[in-house]
């Protein structure tokens, strides 16, 4: 399989993919190189798009959505790993193929994934009136999760120290851009398009309620037993052990789970173990400024 063809792109464990800008948003250079193709992607009316800022519960939501589509059939979800079941539109790793090619080869109905900010979403999704599910996570936990992810994922820039990364994240100089702009852009779009806007913290606190919401949005009718089954199979502890969902099939040269596992904590409030008092004050001040123009609010702890 393509997974094992590493010869055209060799990692020695130190090399990382380079990055560049697309319309002011930092992206891996390979993504920048095919930007026109991504922008011109042709969606189909029955496509379901899952959109998130990186590390906001993407994989979790993908599993839930697929189980809803398949009416709780767990075996169907074990047919292939996450990155093969859900084409990641703007992603390309020379040895693993590209999300675009995957999407084009996939029969309908497709469940697709993107981390693009709303203003960079290929227009065809809106023209075809596709259903889009957006998940937002509080920025403190999101930052911590993204930091650990960049440590283990060679397809993204080296995050440096936690202190350095804290500044990088606040400045929005990470791949897919500023968290603040991302969540606000999708929030502003949600009432004009078929967008279901969910929160990671709600999914944690009351998973059944949120699964029910997704089921209604996808227009499926599932009984209580199936909903409970979906909640069970998409709980953090079960998913962490699921080799088809925990990204353990990606070669270690790209994702090194010994540095930090892909499924690390899946918790709300883990940021308290990372933020110093000074960082927290600085973050809150910055947050207040950047979020002054929106009614969007987040839960930072339970």
From Swiss-Prot:
GO biological process: 3'-phosphoadenosine 5'-phosphosulfate metabolic process; flavonoid metabolic process
Species lineage: Eukaryota, Metazoa, Chordata, Craniata, Vertebrata
A single cellular component GO annotation: cytosol
Keywords for the protein's UniProt record, in alphabetical order: Cytoplasm, Transferase
Reaction(s) the record says it catalyses: a phenol + 3'-phosphoadenylyl sulfate = an aryl sulfate + adenosine 3',5'-bisphosphate + H(+); 17beta-estradiol + 3'-phosphoadenylyl sulfate = 17beta-estradiol 3-sulfate + adenosine 3',5'-bisphosphate + H(+); bisphenol A + 3'-phosphoadenylyl sulfate = bisphenyl A sulfate + adenosine 3',5'-bisphosphate + H(+)
Tissues expressing this chain: Expressed in liver, kidney and jejunum.
Protein name, entry field: Sulfotransferase 1C4
InterPro entries: P-loop_NTPase, Sulfotransferase_dom
Binding sites annotated in the UniProt record for substrate: 113-115
Residues binding 3'-phosphoadenylyl sulfate: 55-60, 137, 145, 200, 234-239, 262-266
